[in-house]
Amino acid sequence: RGLGDVYKRQDNITSVTVEKNGEREKIPCSACVLATGQGARDTYHILYDIGLELLPKAFAVGVRIEHPRELIDRSQYGEFASHPRLGAAEYHLADKAGNRGVYSFCMCPGGVVVASSSGPEQVVTNGMSRHARDEQNSNAAIVVQVDSRDYTVGPLGGLDFQEQIERAAYYAGGGDFTAPAERVGDFLRKAAPKAFGSVKPTYRPGVCRSNLYQCLPDFVSEGIRAGITAFGRRLKGFDMDDAVITAVESRTSSPVRIQRDEEGCATRMKGLYPVGEGAGYAGGIVSAAVDGICLLYTSPSPRDMRR
């Protein structure tokens, strides 16, 4: 179901309308936990239109990078790589590119790059590892910090920024949800993209060899370039020519925060409890779950729901 409308009387929630398969249902309520994901962009617009306090929030965008799993294992484990008691190796990397942070995010050892679009004319990447973590490649997002100086003024400006680069990636990939990708060596040298080498991209439905500078803002491209170079000095082989980068990773966290009061209510609507990633208070599955649990045990109305 999707959120249709939210109704209030004297700043207290009275009902919500939800939509499913084109049908609308109005549900009376005095308390509602709003636990959307950050991809529910229409919800932000609904809340903005009814006067809720929304604030822009820093986030990060970039690309997915893929290396051979065995290379990352050797770089991290050394002589113990491939030991049966050790799983696929992980890494966590961070550096500065000028006055911005650049870092790895959501590292997926022995995993694949997956499509994560939530609407038309978008290419959005993510990563996942299956239980065995035994795929040929390991991948992670390499992202650069973005804040309100980088996009149009207003609480929803970050959404517009995300949509612009997602649309650029969509068309750079050919307009059929194929993702633009290139070898790291070509990206670092700003050379024309060559055929993929020893590392094969795993994104489905597939990739299109592209110059990623054409679908990323300059400060993001240069930040990624500086970051990969720095990470190559710390993790042997990280900047290998045949590593593959695929655009774009744009959903690291919400660019919007729904303001809450000390009881967890939306500041301009009593009884509406925004929680988790979509509300701007979490940056992943576990932190979103923790935010929901904290709300349940600390806020008056959700506490009553436990009965």
Task: Give a label for each model feature.
Residues 8-25:
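Conserved beta-strand-loop-beta-strand element in the redox core of flavoprotein oxidoreductases
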Residues 56-146:
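Mid-to-C-terminal "cap/lid" subdomains and adjacent gly/pro-rich loops that border
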Residues 39-49:
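Flavin (primarily FAD) binding-site architecture
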Residues 2-7, 297-307:
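Single conserved hydrophobic/aromatic residue that forms the stacking wall/gate
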Residues 280-296:
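A conserved FAD-binding loop/helix module that cradles the flavin
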Residues 27-37:
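Short hydrophobic core segments
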Residues 210-276, 289:
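A glycine-rich dinucleotide-binding beta-alpha-beta segment and adjacent secondary-structure elements
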Residues 124-213:
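C-terminal catalytic lobe of FAD-dependent flavoproteins
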